[in-house]
Amino acid sequence: NGQKKYVMNYKNSLKHGLYTEWSIDGRLTKDIEYDMGRPISEYIVEYEGQGYIELNRRNGELSGSWIEWYANGRKSEEGVYKYGKKGGLWTAWYENGEKKYHSKYIDGKPDGIYTEYDSKGRLTANIEYDLGNILTEYHITRDEGGSTEYHKKNGVLDGRWTRWYANGNKAEEGLYEEGKRSGTWNGWYRSNKKHYKSLYADGKRAGTYSEWNSKGKKTKEIDYSNGNRIREYLLIKDGSGYM
């Protein structure tokens, strides 16, 4: 079609200097600097569907900026490679322009705080890394019924766990220790009235579990020991009753 394909310089029959290449529709695809046949530095554009990736190499290894673009012209991901490995700050975005995540890398390993967002710009995760090893995690998940916030340590639930209704009121809250429920857990109705209160030790119910109806009247008490029911007390219309 008459479109230029490439321009190359030679010295003593060897590639030397700048080599430039274009696609059939005239888009730049390569700028490669040669030294007597050996590629020193490379700038490459790889077209994938309607988007594309810009990357750099030095002495055959990824080195320098790396940028991925959406078809709409917005950035998808950007960062830097050092000696073939991710280094420094990396950031990604959704196609609508909202930030997706940002993270720091050292020698190809995530280090420090990794932060993630959903496509509406709301925080979904904060994860602390130490050279690729996860130290602590904070997550918030959302669905039609509401949202859940929780923490992890060493890969298991550890710390406060909270469930929220879609109207913003709390549904349930308590603590995890090393993957097991611990201490006092409380639950609420959507109206914000108390639903239950329960105690846990090593993931098992302990002490007195109390329950209320949606009008705020206590309806039940159950005593537990090591997860086993010891006594159950139901409140009936006249205010008393055992079972």
Where are these regions (language model features)?
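Glycine/tyrosine- and acidic-biased, solvent-exposed loop/turn segments at the edges of beta-strands
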Residues: 1-243
